[in-house]
């Protein structure tokens, strides 16, 4: 724990928003020499497997961000026949039941559904006995987010906040981390009731975006987007892309009807996961 504190302490002191803005600027630079340098060194440092990428040649990307949110070859992530599939590549931070409206962040640390979603008590009450899974995407992972189940898009809330790192050491130290960081809460209806996918920002995450909105503009104010009448077809099918991170972060998946979700028994905190693999069955 002492090492975790030492790693985390500087984050309280550095200008996280300024550093993130600067990183975002360089990630969008289209100068061939600079962007190729950034991409080449990132691949080397994190051992990125470019054979899975739809565009394998690193020099073919216009900028670092285009490389970072690269598409994969469909055959590299076949979709299982499971009722609920994993929406990302990454690892499980925590998974389990929402207890009296509280989600486990790390050992001994909790935060509430209401804090995470920045919503009223009536909405939070729907998830008070639900199920949740927190999925961490490391820098080397594929950074597009897909649908775990067929769902109807209802609304979206942009919630401004801090930009702490979401690496495991930070989650063990910073209280209510996921309810403090900038995030995007996306609300859906499914055949088993309400579902929310929360895309959590972090230090040097240049942008969070969705397939229907594009990059969500960073703001100091909470913003709500109502899609109840905006789209003629709001159903997004299982496995379809729904969003992306321009640099890595975390997805928190919540189901309101906890009695209907039975997580795969092999999924524990620390487990590696991959897009399309079985995640849960509906009982």
Curated annotation (Swiss-Prot):
Enzyme nomenclature, EC number: 4.1.1.65
Cofactors demanded by this protein: pyruvate
Catalytic activity: a 1,2-diacyl-sn-glycero-3-phospho-L-serine + H(+) = a 1,2-diacyl-sn-glycero-3-phosphoethanolamine + CO2
Name recorded for this polypeptide: Phosphatidylserine decarboxylase proenzyme
Protein's pathway: Phospholipid metabolism; phosphatidylethanolamine biosynthesis; phosphatidylethanolamine from CDP-diacylglycerol: step 2/2
Active-site positions on this chain: 89 (charge relay system), 146 (charge relay system), 249 (charge relay system), 249 (schiff-base intermediate with substrate)
Organism placement in taxonomy: Bacteria, Pseudomonadati, Pseudomonadota, Gammaproteobacteria, Legionellales
Similarity remark: Belongs to the phosphatidylserine decarboxylase family. PSD-B subfamily. Prokaryotic type I sub-subfamily.
Any single GO BP term: phosphatidylethanolamine biosynthetic process
Domain of life: Bacteria
């Amino acid at each position: 724990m002492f090492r975790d504190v030492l790693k985390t302490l500087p984050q309280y002191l550095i200008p996280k928003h300024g550093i993130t803005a600067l990183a975002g600027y360089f990630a969008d630079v289209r100068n061939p020499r600079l962007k190729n340098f950034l991409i080449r060194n990132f691949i080397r440092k994190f051992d990125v497997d470019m054979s899975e990428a739809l565009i394998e040649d690193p020099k073919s990307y216009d900028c670092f961000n285009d490389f970072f949110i690269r598409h994969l070859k469909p055959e590299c992530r076949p979709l299982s026949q499971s009722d609920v599939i994993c929406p990302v590549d990454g690892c499980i931070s925590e998974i389990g039941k929402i207890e009296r409206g509280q989600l486990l962040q790390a050992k001994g640390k909790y935060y509430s559904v209401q804090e995470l979603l920045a919503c009223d008590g009536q909405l939070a009450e729907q998830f008070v006995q639900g199920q949740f899974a927190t999925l961490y995407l490391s820098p080397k992972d594929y950074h597009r987010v897909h649908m775990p189940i067929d769902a109807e898009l209802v609304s979206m809330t942009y919630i401004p906040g801090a930009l702490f790192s979401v690496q495991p050491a930070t989650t063990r130290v910073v209280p209510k981390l996921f309810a403090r960081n900038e995030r995007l809460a996306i609300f859906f209806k499914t055949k088993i009731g309400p579902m929310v996918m929360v895309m959590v920002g972090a230090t040097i995450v240049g942008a969070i975006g969705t397939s229907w909105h594009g990059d969500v503009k960073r703001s100091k104010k909470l913003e709500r987007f109502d899609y109840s009448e905006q789209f003629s077809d709001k159903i997004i099918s299982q496995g379809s892309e729904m969003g992306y991170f321009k640099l890595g972060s975390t997805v928190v998946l919540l189901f309101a009807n906890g009695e209907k979700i039975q997580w795969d028994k092999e999924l524990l905190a620390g487990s590696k996961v991959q897009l399309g693999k079985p995640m849960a069955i509906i009982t």
